[in-house]
Amino acid sequence: MQQTLPVTRVSPRVRSLQRFEWPALGLPVTLMLLLVFWQAGVTLSGYPAFILPSPALVAGRFWQALSSGLLWQHTLATLSAALGGFTLALIIALILGYTLAHIRWLEQALAPVLAASQAIPVVAVAPLIILWFGAGLTSKVLVAALITFLPILINTVVAIRSIPRELIEMAYISGANRWQLLRYVEAPLALPVLFGGVRTGLALATTGAVVGEFVAGRVGLGALINIARGLFDTPLIFVALATLALITLTLYVLAGLLERLLVRWEAS
């Protein structure tokens, strides 16, 4: 005898809970746990404030630096260098990556050079860049571009290579030219993989800008950390580090939102 199972209707509230992304709770919970352990470490260790400041002391220093305009000045300098370096690296990496994905012999010729370049830390190259281009914004942009370039390049090559060959052949059979192939086939299909490199590149661009500021910067969050270290202003160091983390997180989230918008636009 065949039995049928009863159909259970799921209420909209339950469906909304099922669609709820529990990882969204990760950041607030992590921050709360970090603050709890931080305060516990301050209380139990007994370290003075210039070694391990309390969260309340750092929050007060943050407001002081923000209201005085000091934090804005250094944050905008770091953000300008990071976005400038990212933009430069993105343009070069997209053009070169697309070329390497289609020209095998060129990829084989440049692959050893690109691999060897990664053995040299950017921190070691930064003094040379500053020596050649000065201690201004240009050198920081170049340092940020250097550290950002390779992840975007690799993801560009992988994204183009991952497109099924059959789709490319069908596009050519349909009479598509090179531009139409890029616009209607390669670009939409490569976006998800490509944006993985973009998000990584944005995070690394901030690191590159700070490296340049550490070496010879008079303005920027890296320079602010150097200044605070010389003054034994440990709360200000924590403020600069928290600001860097906030910048990186914001850029990462914005890149994810941009990816969703572009994917929806291409799908429509």
Curated annotation (Swiss-Prot):
The complex is likely composed of an ATP-binding protein, a transmembrane protein (RibX) and a solute-binding protein (RibY). PANTHER family: ABC TRANSPORTER PERMEASE PROTEIN HI_0355-RELATED (PTHR30151:SF20), ALKANE SULFONATE ABC TRANSPORTER-RELATED, MEMBRANE SUBUNIT (PTHR30151). One of its GO terms (biological process) is transmembrane transport. Belongs to the binding-protein-dependent transport system permease family. Residues 75-255 form the ABC transmembrane type-1 domain. InterPro entries: MetI-like (IPR000515), MetI-like_sf (IPR035906). It is found in: Cell membrane. It comes from Chloroflexus aurantiacus (strain ATCC 29366 / DSM 635 / J-10-fl). Pfam families: BPD_transp_1. The lineage of its organism: Bacteria, Bacillati, Chloroflexota, Chloroflexia, Chloroflexales. It is a multi-pass membrane protein. One of its GO terms (cellular component) is plasma membrane. This is Riboflavin transport system permease protein RibX. PROSITE patterns: ABC_TM1. The chain crosses the membrane at residues 24-44, 76-96, 119-139, 140-160, 185-205, 236-256. Keywords: Cell membrane, Membrane, Transmembrane, Transmembrane helix, Transport. Part of an ABC transporter complex that transports riboflavin into the cell. Induction: Expression is probably regulated by riboflavin, via an FMN riboswitch. The keyword Transmembrane helix applies.
